[in-house]
């Protein structure tokens, strides 16, 4: 074969070159499984209906953000059935249709466990979602939440309809359900995979012994195991390092943490008050907004390193986190926030800088398991 022929065979197609030039992220295996997800992952909590929470983006504001994320390579989108009472999933489906995004080119992640209200009973904020003990007393909501076989199948069928798809890439349990036998939950989840409704399984915040028990049972029965853990982890909240992160690393489970910037706390100076609607509505016991000298000292060190490196503070926090996880889940309120997060890709801290950021950490009450 002539050199010219070899050159033609090796020549990169223009379409591939164009695609690579537009891709601003890297893709990482989700733990030990074969699926690759974008870093970062787009968080859908911010998308849906501002009636649910005032800082949530309505459809007309969310659509261009979803388009901008996809155009830049953020092809992994995380949501939950309960986000905006199902509206988050619906907006994502509309974006795929409006922008002609092929279903096979995005990774859709959603969750089950909490109550999704009937539309006529839709309450702002948490509403019924946080009152499971009362939901079980209602003819409308009994078997509509939790991790029973009935609740899981009800949830996945509803999510498939809202998302406008016949399969979910990663179906996650939002929390652990102590009222249901683990075998019932894991058997139902395995059946979803075998039926083709779900391709991978993931889990979210819970105690490590609970997660390990579910994984061990699935392994013993030959059922599908979880490939990801979506836990609460950032420079301010590191309780997950005690057990969950070690367990996941040892067993090949991918880590995709929520609140990587501590609701923006790690992206602004200690003296700087947030002007976001979300922060102004979250000062109700959150560890991020409470008066806490230890948190302020950690954030001050983030700022110090950011100034030295001429980086935004968010890049320092993300550089520290990206070394330890598969990909953080970030909620974007503007295209500018997407650009800022993507500019952090590939940035690394020195070992001395990492120690400097970590050494002030003090134990905190567990948050996010309920």
UniProtKB/Swiss-Prot annotation:
Superkingdom to which the source organism belongs: Eukaryota
Drop me one GO molecular function for this one: oxidoreductase activity
InterPro entries to which the protein is assigned, alphabetical? AKR_Detox_Biosynth, NADP_OxRdtase_dom, NADP_OxRdtase_dom_sf
Give a yes or no for keyword Transferase in this entry.
Answer: no
Q: Name one Pfam family in it.
A: Aldo_ket_red
Its annotated pathway reads: Secondary metabolite biosynthesis
Q: Where does substrate bind?
A: 174
Keywords (alphabetical) are: NADP, Oxidoreductase
Q: Enzyme group, top EC level?
A: oxidoreductase
Keyword Ligase in annotation: no
Supply the EC number(s): 1.1.1.-
Q: Where is the active site?
A: 83 (proton donor)
Gene3D superfamilies registered for this protein in UniProt: NADP-dependent oxidoreductase domain (3.20.20.100)
Binding residues for NADP(+): 78, 204-205, 230, 259-269, 333-341
Q: What does this protein do?
A: Aldo-keto reductase; part of the gene cluster that mediates the biosynthesis of sansalvamide, a cyclic pentadepsipeptide that shows promising results as potential anti-cancer drug. The nonribosmal peptide synthetase NRPS30 produces sansalvamide by incorporating successively one phenylalanine, one leucine, one alpha-hydroxyisocaproic acid (HICA), one valine and one leucine before sansalvamide is released from by cyclization by the terminal C domain of NRPS30.
The UniProt entry's sequence similarity note says: Belongs to the aldo/keto reductase family.
Q: Write down what this protein is called.
A: Aldo-keto reductase NECHADRAFT_45914
Native species: Fusarium vanettenii (strain ATCC MYA-4622 / CBS 123669 / FGSC 9596 / NRRL 45880 / 77-13-4)
